[in-house]
Structures are given as structure tokens and as C-alpha cells.
Amino acid sequence: MEENKIRIGITQGDINGVGYEVILKTFSDPTMLELCTPIIYGSPKVAAYHRKALDVQANFSIVNTASEAGYNRLSVVNCTDDEVKVEFSKPDPEAGKAALGALERAIEEYREGLIDVIVTAPINKHTIQSEEFSFPGHTEYIEERLGNGNKSLMILMKNDFRVALVTTHIPVREIATTITKELIQEKLMIFHRCLKQDFGIGAPRIAVLSLNPHAGDGGLLGMEEQEIIIPAMKEMEEKGIICYGPYAADGFMGSGNYTHFDGILAMYHDQGLAPFKALAMEDGVNYTAGLPVVRTSPAHGTAYDIAGKGLASEDSFRQAIYVAIDVFRNRQREKAARVNPLRKQYYEKRDDSDKLKLDTVDED
């Protein structure tokens, strides 16, 4: 079984935040090393500094590449300038440079087939900006680098509670003009496919939230529901995608109606993430769906306010590891099923004789 362990590439994120703390705390539990082979892309020197400062009992090996990572060990690939300094809670362009270097190396080794999935620790979206990185965040960067032309979908999840976003990191004033029928349909299709292939749900039920208060109140508070969202949903229903709504976000979330669906599609960032984080901040996971690569991250940021104090909970990061493993395994099973589709055997009655007929499962 050892050779079948999933190799998880972990990017260090912002070295002045809680990234190393949650990584080291997660893998201080020996049972985590039985599930996967974790490889940190970062700095052994920085990792050792965090380990000592936070008094975390986690050992690691230094390797040149993920191909050298040993079983039942946490490994660190050095891809950061040894002179970089850790200054807890301080936004620093050098820390941003180190975060980008780790991300680039992880992507490079993923392309080489040395790791199976990527789990990213939080970055500072300001200090990482450079000529090489001009994106709002991880999601858009990874879509550009590893998407192969596919569009991504941001999903925040905890167990069966999954919230996806039509629009992500854009100003509120641009939301209404950005949302189109085509964009909603694109996100619904990705969400539907993800729920089936990545989470093994046979017939996913998706709830769609409205853009305007009270779902537009019959046009009194806006026409986007009537002119964009509902027509988009009707066309998707004709293609076999099960979607309901649009629901007013406040009543839908406040009533607990979200528990009756496999996924919820929100129109914009805070509409989806505010209730999600209120309900599942501690161990929620950010999953980037729709791409060939499996990428997850914890649902929190750099948490500068508690960096270096030993107060950060590793629960969300641990769940990000679990989700990456589960999705990768589900995709492998899906791939195997497509290569060797199950065959149905049934008898067809003809002229008082039974004829064995073989049929293959629809490949969707």
C-alpha cells in the first residue's frame, strides 16, 4: 500500500503568517503520515524557525525534489532564499517573493508528475504581487498555470455543505454587470460535473441564490433574476442539471434550507462566504474545482493577528488535506470506470428464447 500513498505538494504560503504553524501541527500527528506523503515547498530554515518558536513536535527531512521524499516522513524542498527573515505578523515583499517561489516550484513538479495534488497555505495577496504574479489570488493563478484552458470554480466546503461562487474577487460595483446567463451556466456545469466526479454524487441537487434582495421581488428590486438567472437555470435543466431557485440568500441560509442540497451557487463572494464562514470557519476548506489539478487550501488567511503565538488551529488545514485525498481518489476511480466501463447484463425475451445482451454504461 505504501507505493499508492498520495503525494501532496504543500506550498508554504506567507512565512510571516500561520501557514507553517498549521502545516507542522497537522503533521505532528503520526497518523497523517500514514495517509499520504507530504512535501512542503518552502525553506527548511524557515520551517525549523517556526518549529522552534512555536514548540511544535514535527520532524522533517530536507530533499532536493519531491522524488526523494520518503514514506512516513514530512519532507521539505528548499526553494527559498536562505537569507529571508521571518518577522511574524509583518507584511513583507520578501515573504511574498518566497511564497511565489514555493508556488512556482510546486507547479513545476506537479507538471513533472512528482506530486499528485497541491494544498496551498495562505498568502498575502498584496505582498505576492509582482511581474510574475498579477492575480487576485491562488485560484486565478492556478487556473492560468494549470487549467489547460479549463475554467475554475471556487467552492468553500465542509462535509456536505458546499458553496460555489459565480463571481469571486471583483469589486461589488462590478458584480451586476459581470453576471451573465452564460457565466451562470458555465459555473452550473462545472459545479454539476464536480459534484458527480469529485464527490461521487449521482444526481446532484444545486440551489441557486438570487442577486437582489428577496429574489428581486418580482422585478421591484431588480430584473436580474427574471432576465438572467431564471433563463440560465431553465436551459441547464433541459440539459439534465438539477437546479432550484433562485432563492433569497438571507431566508435560504437562515432557515437551514441549505441542508437539503448538495451544493449552493452564490452570485458573489461575500454572499456565499459570509454565511459559510459563520457556520464552518473552523474546519472549512477552499476547493478549486473544474481544473485537471486537485487543489485545496484552508478556509482562513494569513491570520497575522495570531501569527507566532501558537494559537492557530490546524483543523481547517487538516481538512484541506483530507479533501485533496478524497477528490484525487474519486477522480482515479472515475477514470478507471471510464477506461473499463461496467457492463450491464440483462435478458431480452424473443421468440420464447432468452438472449444475453451486453450493454455499456453511458459515459456521461
From Swiss-Prot:
It comes from the Bacteria. Its EC number is 1.1.1.262. A divalent metal cation binds at residues 169, 214, 269. It is found in: Cytoplasm. Pathway: Cofactor biosynthesis; pyridoxine 5'-phosphate biosynthesis; pyridoxine 5'-phosphate from D-erythrose 4-phosphate: step 4/5. SUPFAM superfamilies: Isocitrate/Isopropylmalate dehydrogenase-like. Its cofactor is a divalent metal cation. InterPro entries: PdxA_fam. The active site is located at the dimer interface. This is 4-hydroxythreonine-4-phosphate dehydrogenase.
